[in-house]
């Protein structure tokens, strides 16, 4: 085997090793210490949810729903107040047109629902905004009818009070049932009192501070429904008598029939007044204290009044028991215990989080909320209540358990907390990885099936299984482009060579267009990074789309057997025109850290942490600054991420980076370009090669190798060093071989042979390759000619003995030094001129010393030279003839050869 072939085989053996080493280098690697982040939401939220309303019959109520980004379309759901428990149903546009009580209008990111207040329209309403396959639901708005009615217990109730001057009189007018809460009007001697002269609350209590003789008279009240304007006059009356003369001293006490509120409810942020009723003479003074609310009485938010304690900007920590002491120096003092309950709207403290979940697995979603009264928690799965899902169970603490996650659960999962004061919601994006069915058991959606013959070997069936990628997640990049993200789970199926992206436009008429395939081949080994649990993510963009159109996308995987299989189809995606979209926050690249020779760490920030609610993640773009090629892309999930490591870079190279935030329906503008450099290679002496044990275990093709960058560089450098050593050895061996084949005493013979091409002829025994040898004619001294004749005679005798056995021989050519003989080169000659020269030599040898000759053929010894050297060749008539072909590329150095300069022609 020649040296060249050995070297080629060596390279072939080394190439797979180098390829495997290079493939083991991770392309993208997550940050070593990432900050904990919640699962990404859909990137959209309800900015303005419909509000609960109380209206009189026949009025028109408008519910308004506004989203942060324009959805694909709006829907409204309704649950009648007559159904227990309430069951929501969607209000279709067709039914809304037929029903004159309901009208639905949409305008970009705002939807309005107009409802005529009637008994059949009372209930709860929700707004549902659809963003492709995601349904984001608003909080519930209640529609109630205004009403007011009196309490029969207070009928014909009259009070007669005699009070000393200077006291504060608190009179409770009566109790009414009103929705909404009524406003109160008081009358003194049947004349309405101005509001500024009275102090009252929503419970119908009249406060008359520092009464005097002028305060004596008859008092009554009227309750008015603020929504309908209906007035209700209560029959209760107060006959108050304030003597002008002084009365006897009395201890503080309650008047006959006077009420004391021992429990007060107030909302956080409002101003509350705790009343301390009681009269005496002299008028008593109130002293306040609280055993379980330290510092609540004497602070900048409280004010002690003669008739009560006023607390402004109420906070939950103000809740507790308050004690009022009425004392005028006469024992016993009057004591009241009042419990203050601070009500608060619900607020979710711990929203649910969800990651990629395999179909059939068990999942628990947690949701913790606060509020007063204690909020009730319920769940919606893509707008549908979890109560009607057989796989869902809500435990007493409010958490939701999905015993077996199904594909229908994929989408937006929302947790709602509500009480009498309001409602609050939070959600998360739930992604479901469907089960991989064996070949032949699909649902008919996969068109790329393997054409291999079925086999009974289970092992072989697993090896030929083609595991498809996941359905792509779609994000808007511009008016004409989207970004697709998909993943491949670790498996034992066939290796994937590359991906193709397919998309299809959906028309309003429902007519489907054919699938379009992009031109780009997305290699399996490019643009990937690990997201944990053996999942490899991929990213690609699709351009040339039409705005305000709906599309579906899917990923086609091409495997090592040149067969293909497609992923599940994405949900319907509506490509919204950018002018109608609210801009997302643009991340700011703060620093690019030189992490290693092949990796850098990006650090960025947002202008406000509140922008995280609209963001699902970030796209990182990078390329060498000296290149104008396409940017490489990386996907960073999680709005709370603030750093990310990008590896597999060139050592000591400057790169340019830019970031872009994205949500489910849009992407932000690019951040400003920022350059960063990887660490330069460290200058060190060449270490001695160290042999390491090689693990021959072949990993799965979908398995990621997380190698240290220093180890990766060492392996690559060692491989290059081995290649350099082999190349040097090859060059040295080839040089020695060339020296052995070209002796120094025949420097021009090879050049002469290159100028002639032999013609193969058929031998009686076997085909032979004919060689032509042309030797220079001796034109030098007689001594040199005689020495040459002796050498030729010896060669002739040796080869003549071999001729009888071989049937063919090739005479060793006689070589003369052309420079010594004075030749400058060879002249171009045809085969006929060669034969004439040969015959001339023969006649010269036969004629002895006849004639003068320039070639010294008349010298003694010429005849013997011709007979001994040339005649055996000329007389070998039984040998096949030689035909000499002249090459068209005869070099110029042979153009000086004359017809008389040839000594012999070997045939």
From Swiss-Prot:
Which residues are connected by disulfide bridges in this protein? 65-127, 173-221, 276-324, 367-415
Q: Which GO terms describe its biological process?
A: axon guidance; compound eye development; cuticle pattern formation; homotypic cell-cell adhesion; maintenance of protein location in extracellular region; segment specification; smoothened signaling pathway; wing disc anterior/posterior pattern formation
Annotated region described as Disordered, given as residue ranges: 427-474, 676-701, 780-805, 829-881
Q: Which UniProt keywords apply?
A: Disulfide bond, Glycoprotein, Heparin-binding, Immunoglobulin domain, Membrane, Proteoglycan, Repeat, Signal, Transmembrane, Transmembrane helix
Residues exposed to the Cytoplasmic side: 731-907
The protein's name: Interference hedgehog
Q: In terms of domain of life, where is this protein from?
A: Eukaryota
Originating organism: Drosophila virilis (Fruit fly)
Q: Which residues lie on this side of the membrane: Extracellular?
A: 24-709
Binding sites annotated in the UniProt record for heparin: 504, 511, 513, 552
Protein function: Mediates response to the active Hedgehog (Hh) protein signal in embryos, functioning upstream or at the level of patched (ptc).
GO CC annotation, single? membrane
Q: Give start-end positions of Low complexity composition bias.
A: 781-794, 853-863
Residue positions the entry lists as glycosylated: 101, 203, 300, 355, 473, 537, 548, 568, 702
* Subunit description: Homodimer. Heterotetramer; 2 iHog chains bind 2 hh chains when facilitated by heparin, heparin is required to promote high-affinity interactions between hh and iHog.
- Which parts of the chain are coiled coil? none
Q: Which SMART domains does this chain map to?
A: FN3, IG, IGc2
Task: Name the Pfam families on file.
Answer: fn3, Ig_3
Q: What is the recorded membrane topology of this protein?
A: Single-pass type I membrane protein
Family membership: Belongs to the immunoglobulin superfamily. IHOG family.
* Domain (Fibronectin type-III) ranges: 468-578, 586-681
